[in-house]
Regions:
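Proteins that catalyze or organize thiol-disulfide redox chemistry
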Residues: 1-51, 59-104
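Conserved residues in the N-terminal Rossmann fold of short-chain dehydrogenase/reductase
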Residues: 54
Length: 104
């Protein structure tokens, strides 16, 4: 199951030492709903290896502003506490999986 990231816990998760994938989304966003099951599947596949979760941009305003998120879905990838990749828009599972594997 994908983690629930918030403005309050995001820094701690990014700085945990594990690779991180964050899906910035909103309930009203159609493309976000298309990506959501893919994020859940990847969270299960990479459980224990990569912290994979979602951050609701309507409930958490600070973090999207810090990373310049203007469109959703946007997915950010972190390694060693630094952002190393970014994907904007609905993306096929194979593409996202390759980006997650590149974090390992």
């Amino acid at each position: 199951m994908a983690l629930e990231f918030t403005d309050d816990n995001i820094k701690e998760i990014i700085e945990s030492g594990k690779p991180v994938m964050i899906d910035f989304w909103a309930e009203w966003c159609g493309p976000c709903r298309m990506v959501s099951p893919i994020v859940e599947e990847l969270a299960e596949e990479f459980s224990g290896k990569v912290e994979i979760g979602k951050l609701n941009v309507d409930d958490n305003i600070q973090t999207p502003n810090e990373y310049g998120i203007r469109n959703i879905p946007t997915i950010l990838f972190f390694k060693d506490g630094k952002m190393v990749d970014k994907q904007i828009g609905a993306t096929p599972k194979a593409s996202l999986k390759a980006k997650v594997e590149a974090l390992l």
